[in-house]
Amino acid sequence: MASGVSPAHPQTPVGAGSRDLSLKGTPSDGMQPRGADTLEGHSLPTDGPPHRGGDHDPAAGKRGDSGLLRVCAALSIPKPSEAVRPSRIPRAPRVPREPRVPREPREPRVPRSPREPRVPRIPRDPRPPRPPRVPREPRPPREPRATRGLA
């Protein structure tokens, strides 16, 4: 058993040309390295879908592009006709409103007279502090109920 591998997930051998990675994250024999390891102009086929058009085709796959993001985006974005649906809530038919009757203008408001200033509250004298509690004496133990009722 290799160190760091749990028994629930045994390490499976990775064959040549396999797209899987081993648990340690090393590329299999058939995979081309990506990123900094790749040569800029190498002639080997790269991972990803084949190029559809020329260099300027926006839908063509980039080197190292699996195309999965573009496929998922194409499947998950609804068309505008699907996105704007009439609501299923039945609406009451609109009743035409009566035309508004113009009202006569209001008289201008008379500003209120300022209120009288409040009389400040006179604070009461604080209460005298309570005397400290004196602990009571414990009560004598009571006799059991059975003997009390018979006497």
Curated annotation (Swiss-Prot):
Organismal lineage: Viruses, Duplodnaviria, Heunggongvirae, Peploviricota, Herviviricetes
Region listing for 11 X 6 AA tandem repeats, in residue ranges: 90-146
Biased amino acid composition, Basic and acidic residues: 49-65, 95-151
Domain of life the protein comes from: Viruses
Protein name per its UniProtKB record: Probable RNA-binding protein
Keywords, alphabetical: DNA-binding, Host cytoplasm, Host nucleus, Host-virus interaction, Inhibition of host autophagy by virus, Inhibition of host innate immune response by virus, Inhibition of host interferon signaling pathway by virus, Inhibition of host MDA5 by virus, Inhibition of host PKR by virus, Inhibition of host RIG-I by virus, Inhibition of host RLR pathway by virus, Interferon antiviral system evasion, Late protein, Phosphoprotein, Repeat, RNA-binding, Viral immunoevasion
PTM entry text: May be phosphorylated on Ser residues by host kinases.
Sequence repeat ranges, renumbered to this chain: 90-95, 96-101, 102-104, 105-110, 111-116, 117-122, 123-128, 129-130, 131-134, 135-140, 141-146
GO MF terms held by the record: DNA binding; protein serine/threonine kinase inhibitor activity; RNA binding
Function: Plays a role in the inhibition of host immune response. Participates in the inhibition of host autophagy by interacting with and inhibiting host PKR/EIF2AK2. This interaction also prevents the interferon-induced shut down of protein synthesis following viral infection. Downmodulates the host RLR signaling pathway via direct interaction with host RIGI and IFIH1. May also participate in nuclear egress of viral particles through interactions with host NCL and regulation of the viral UL34 mRNA.
